[in-house]
């Protein structure tokens, strides 16, 4: 890739690399190569494998795409799929009604893909709440944080969450504090949008 070759020649590096929606196998390959070229012991790679929701893949994607996305997640430090995306990448059955054991099993299977920290978004253990649950493979540590579920759905909330999470990490906060800030900020964005659509 001439762009990444130029970056290398100019000795350009990155404190963080964050990916969201990727539209093709080719784009995943380009990003995978970029990760290989620019990963350092000190930087952070976060992948939001945007491709599915509510038990279904988006129309442009199939199960082969989900498996390909799983190979990209393997190269990340942190991954932030929703439950649907995680079910397609791990082969676990998607459930609308679940318990903590199901979520922990799914996080374990996500961790097996290779990322240091796996996070599931849209996790709810109690009616009227929605939250995130993360798993730190190295320290065998889980973290759950929830907010009141707001009765609205907007495109881009996952992007806000992941972007805020990266921003918090870049400001020196640990992964748990970063998830909390990102969840709170996303909830506040939804709340303000509901007040003034």
Model regions and ranges:
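Short pre-catalytic strand/loop immediately N-terminal to key active-site residues, enriched for Gly-Thr
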Residues: 141-155
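Charged C-terminal helix
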Residues: 176-197
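Short beta-strands and strand-loop turn motifs
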Residues: 16-19, 44-54, 80-89, 120, ...
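Conserved phosphate/ATP/ADP-binding segment of small-molecule kinases
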Residues: 60-141
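SAM-dependent methyltransferases
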Residues: 138-140, 152, 193-197
């Amino acid at each position: 890739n001439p762009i990444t070759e130029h970056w290398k020649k100019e000795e350009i590096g990155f404190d963080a690399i964050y990916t969201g929606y990727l539209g093709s196998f080719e784009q995943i390959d380009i990003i995978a190569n970029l990760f290989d070229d620019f990963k350092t012991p000190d930087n952070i790679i976060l992948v939001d494998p945007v491709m599915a929701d509510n038990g279904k893949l988006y129309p442009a994607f199939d199960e082969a795409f989900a498996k390909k996305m799983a190979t990209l997640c393997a190269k990340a430090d942190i991954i932030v799929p929703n439950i649907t995306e995680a079910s397609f990448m791990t082969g676990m059955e998607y459930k609308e009604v679940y318990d903590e054991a199901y979520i922990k099993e799914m996080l374990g299977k996500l961790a097996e893909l290779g990322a240091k920290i796996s996070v599931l978004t849209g996790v709810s253990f109690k009616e009227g709440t929605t939250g995130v649950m993360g798993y730190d493979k190295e320290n065998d540590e889980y973290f759950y944080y929830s907010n009141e579920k707001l009765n609205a759905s907007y495109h881009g909330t996952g992007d806000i969450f992941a972007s805020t999470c990266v921003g918090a990490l870049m400001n020196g906060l640990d992964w748990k504090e970063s998830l909390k800030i990102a969840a709170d900020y996303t909830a506040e964005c939804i709340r303000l949008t509901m007040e003034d659509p």
